[in-house]
Amino acid sequence: MLDFFTIFSKGGLVLWCFQGVSDSCTGPVNALIRSVLLQERGGNNSFTHEALTLKYKLDNQFELVFVVGFQKILTLTYVDKLIDDVHRLFRDKYRTEIQQQSALSLLNGTFDFQNDFLRLLREAEESSKIRAPTTMKKFEDSEKAKKPVRSMIETRGEKPKEKAKNNKKNKGAKKEGSDGPLATSKAAPAEKSGLPVGPENGEELSKEEQIRRKREEFIQKHGRGMEKSSKSSKSDAPKEKGKKAPRVWALGGSANKEVLDYSTPTTNGAPEAAPPEDINLIRGTGPGRQLQDLDCSSSDDEGAAQNSTKPSATKGTLGGMFGMLKGLVGSKSLTREDMESVLDKMRDHLIAKNVAADIAVQLCESVANKLEGKVMGTFSTVTSTVKQALQESLVQILQPQRRVDMLRDIMDAQRHQRPYVVTFCGVNGVGKSTNLAKISFWLLENGFSVLIAACDTFRAGAVEQLRTHTRRLSALHPPEKHGGRTMVQLFEKGYGKDAAGIAMEAIAFARNQGFDVVLVDTAGRMQDNAPLMTALAKLITVNTPDLVLFVGEALVGNEAVDQLVKFNRALADHSMAQTPRLIDGIVLTKFDTIDDKVGAAISMTYITSKPIVFVGTGQTYCDLRSLNAKAVVAALMKA
C-alpha cells in the first residue's frame, strides 16, 4: 500500500498528488528536496525519511519530479515499474500543458490523473502477484543427485585425468585375470629379490608374514643406497679454507668509535641550555588574525593555460568551421548512451584525484540523472555539458548546509558567561595536536583566551607535546601584552586517567578562571576499536561540547569514507543520550602534500554533509586556511 504519489515541477509547483495512507506528503517531500535534490545527491533513486522510503524519478526535459512514498518495512517490487509507467503516461497525456513552461499555465492547467493512476497501480499490483516466488530446488532434482556416490569420491592430490586413466587400467586388469601378462610382470621382481610372494608348498602366507618380508625387502633395497650416498658425501666433502680477509676500500673511512664520536668531551652527555626560540620561525608568515581562503592554483597552471591557448589561436578558418558544425550537432536531448563514455572518463579522473571509488560512482550517476532528457545548448558538446554539470554538483557538495562560525559562537558563549568547548577526534597520526595548536594561535590572535585540556592519556609524549605548544604560544602572547592576563594555559592530569573526567575538570577550571575557549585534545583511535570509541562517546556525552571536530588527513582515499561512517556510527551506538551527538565539522590536514589530488575533501563532505571548517597547509601556526569550494573544484577538474 502506497502512502502517497506526487508530481511537481522543479520550480516547486505541485501538479498532481495522490494521498494514500499518509495524511500529508509535505514533510517527506521537503526533506527529499532539501537533502537530495538541492545537495546534488541523486546518484541513488531512493531516500529514507523516518519510517518512509521515498523513490523518485527526474524528467529533465520537462523539469518534473515524480515521487512515491511507502513504509520502509514493506518490500514493494512493483514501485519502479509503477513510477516509470506513470512518468510515461503523464508526460504523453499533458505534453501540451507542460511544454508551455510558464508557472501561470501550470497553475491554470487541470491535471485529472486520478483514474489513470489507479488503473496503473492496479495493473502493477496484479503483475507482481502473477510472478510466483522462486522456490529452492530439491536435492533429488539436482544433477548431483543423479551421479553415483563412487564417482564423486576424489583422492587428495590426484588430478582428474590421472584418475580416469587409473580407472581404465583397473578395469583392464580385471578383464585379463590373474594368468595374463600382468601377473607375470608382477612375479618378476619377486624372483629377483628371492622372496616368495605367492603360495608356498600349497599353503598361503599370512598377512603378518607378507608384511614382514616386504619390510625386509625394503630395508635391503634402500639400505645399500644410503651407504653409497654416505661414502660419496664423505669423499666429496671440500676441505676447509682459511677465512678471507675483508677488503679495505680506498675511500671507505673508518668504523672506530673514537673517530665517529663528534660529541664534546667536556659535557659528558649532559643536556646543553636550550637555544632561544625564533619567534618568526614558530609563528610563520602571514596574518594570523583572519583566515585566508585556500588557494589551489599555481604558476604552472597559468603557464599551461597560456600554452594551451597558443595552438588554438594558430588554427585556420577551416578548424573553426568544423568546430561550429560540431557544436550545431550538439543541440539534442541527452541520453545515457551519449553520456556513458564521458561519465566513465570523469569517474576515472575523480578516482585518480583521490575521490573514493563509491562516491565517484554516485556523483557520476547523479549527474546522469540530472542531465538525462535535457536539451543541450546550440553550441555545446556532450563533454562540456557533463563537465559543467559535474562542476556545479561538486561546488554544491562543498558548500555546507550549516556554516560553522566559531568567532560568533564564542562571543555568544561569552554573553552567557561560559567557556566555548571544542573537542578534537580522529585516527592516529593525522595531526590533531598540531592543528589544535594552530587553532589556538588563531583564537589568541583574535583576542580570546584558550585553555588546552590534555585528554590524550594514552599516547606517550602527548602531554609533553601540548606543553611545548603552550610554552611557544605563551612566548608569542605573553601576559604583558594583555594586561597581565594569562592567554593560554595547559590543563593536564598525567597519563592513564579517565579522559571524560579530565575534560569535565578542565571545563570547570575554565569557567572559574574566566577562559573563553576550551580545546579538548583526545587520543587517536581506529574506527574499529570499540573500547576507545566507547570512551570517546562517553567524553562527548558527559561534557556536551559546543563543537565536535573530526581531524582527517587529505592523503586518504577510500579510507576517509570508512573512518567517517564508522566514527559517526560508533558515536551514535555508544552514546547514552536520547539524541546522540555526532561530528559537527571536519579539519582537513596535510593539504600541502597532495598537490591537486584534493578528492578527500569531496569524500568527507559527501559522506557526512558536514562542512570543512579548517584546512591545515603547513607546519607553522599561520598555516591554517578556510576552504574555498571553487578553488578545490578547479584543482579537482584540472587534467
Curated annotation (Swiss-Prot):
Modified residues (Phosphothreonine): T285, T579
Cellular localisation: Endoplasmic reticulum membrane
Annotated stretches, region: Disordered: 132-317
Residues annotated to bind GTP: 426-433, 521-525, 589-592
Gene3D superfamilies per record: 3.30.450.60, P-loop containing nucleotide triphosphate hydrolases, Signal recognition particle SRP54, nucleotide-binding domain
Compositional bias of kind Polar residues: 305-315
Compositionally biased spans, kind Basic and acidic residues: 137-146, 153-165, 204-240
Oligomer and partners: Heterodimer with SRPRB. Interacts with the signal recognition particle (SRP) complex subunit SRP54.
Protein name (record): Signal recognition particle receptor subunit alpha
Species name: Bos taurus (Bovine)
